[in-house]
């Protein structure tokens, strides 16, 4: 493949595992509190739209940045996932990024997060039903497990980090 020939190991990517995933996928580890992630978001959205059919961009929000308590960061993860479930993931990500990076505002409580989404046309009943639901908490825990796995083996050292097929960084 001519395009693949342009990428050089050690220059454009690093091999981080011996085996790749059984199904193609791209994972982006990011934080709403990360300025680099804020600036990378348009690139990530374009990447998601240009991936081959059936290859998802899985956005994994991390909770290890010192800018906010892990509980606040996990609440933002849930808010983003609600947006994604409502087919408004990019919109919700943009709202949260702008609130933090353009407005310089801080989330003091779950209600602050809820209010931001509700004033921007996210349905209150759906938000309330999903925010603390067991499936939501399980999904957040799965993200945390991936964060821990890749952090402990030295792959996830900062954000944004993009992994392709669980093998290439």
Language-model-detected regions and their locations in the chain:
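A structure-centric signal for secondary-structure junctions around beta-strands
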Residues: 23, 76, 156-159
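A broad, low-specificity signal for short, low-complexity segments enriched in glycine/proline
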Residues: 19-21, 75-76, 119-126
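Extracytoplasmic thiol/disulfide redox context detector
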Residues: 1-68, 144, 148-152
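C-terminal cap of thioredoxin/glutaredoxin-like
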Residues: 31, 118-169
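Short, flexible active-site loop motifs that bind/organize anionic cofactors or intermediates
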Residues: 27, 103, 117
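Aromatic side chains
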Residues: 12-13, 29-32, 40, 80, ...
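Short hydrophobic/aromatic-rich motifs at helix boundaries and adjacent loops
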Residues: 15-19, 50-52, 84-88, 115-119, ...
